[in-house]
Amino acid sequence: DRICTGITSSNSPHVVKTATQGEVNVTGVIPLTTTPTKSHFANLKGTKTRGKLCPKCLNCTDLDVALGRPKCMGTIPSAKASILHEVKPVTSGCFPIMHDRTKIRQLPNLLRGYEHIRLSTHNVINAETAPGGPYKVGTSGSCPNVTNGNGFFATMAWAVPKNDNNKTATNPLTVEVPYICTEGEDQITVWGFHSDNEIQMVKLYGDSKPQKFTSSANGVTTHYVSQIGGFPNQAEDGGLPQSGRIVVDYMVQKSGKTGTITYQRGILLPQKVWCASGRSKVIKGSLPLIGQADCLHEKYGGLNKSKPYYTGEHAKAIGNCPIWVKTPLKLANGTKYRPPAKLLKER
């Protein structure tokens, strides 16, 4: 008898590309890549995920919440990850806002980037006694409060001269905006100004000329000049038609730093401020969040990691995610394929 050593031969459908030998047939491979299919977005496993800024604020946009619309006040949950579900943030209800004049649509996105967000319990400025006053705090029937009375945004006070004695034109006035957050957070201070047609400007403020406004905080200074008139009547969210408009902006104050606002008539003075800390990873997505996933991917939604790599569309992803590669990867777990040996005839 004879004992012959060798390797098992079989047909091999597996081809791998190697660095030194090019394409090589092997007896077995393990796929390392997957191509995901689009799915709904989900909560990220092992961490808190935020969809809407205020999940319990019904019929409210994130901009409503960020501005403190009277019927949109609530707790913003802490989260390590946030879904940017309003890619082009919609307008706020309440009072018509000139969104194209400022960066105010970025405010909800700014807040989403923080892990912890809370609204101050106290006002940052006493609006009634601010320079140029005394003032009464204006309200609007287009901005109903929880009892359906006239209201306004919680983050701002509409400073209307209280009597005819101070209902006159004024030179620029300056008010300091103190830092009032208590835990070293970033303070996001919302402010703005109101303008209308000449008749309404004289009626409210005693001056029909364009007004000047400037904010300064954390090394950033912004200037505005109000537009007088030329606005068509506009109703927001079923409210009363308004001939006026408001311009709204914000400034970020670091711990212990004071900001300033210089203004004339029509100022919307800051009131309650946002105190925000920590970082939340933000990714574009959609709501609702259904179930849990290892990874959130802008193009594919919620993914559960089954392979270390993926092919397909490359986009931002957060969580325990596979790594994008251009072409599929395989790991050879067999031997190099050799064709069946021919039997030799005995002599």
UniProtKB/Swiss-Prot annotation:
Gene3D superfamilies: 3.90.209.20, Hemagglutinin Chain A, Domain 2. It comes from the Viruses. Pfam families: Hemagglutinin. It is found in: Virion membrane; Host apical cell membrane. GO terms for biological process: fusion of virus membrane with host endosome membrane; fusion of virus membrane with host plasma membrane; symbiont entry into host cell; virion attachment to host cell. It is a single-pass type I membrane protein. Homotrimer of disulfide-linked HA1-HA2. Major glycoprotein, comprises over 80% of the envelope proteins present in virus particle. This is Hemagglutinin. The gene is HA.
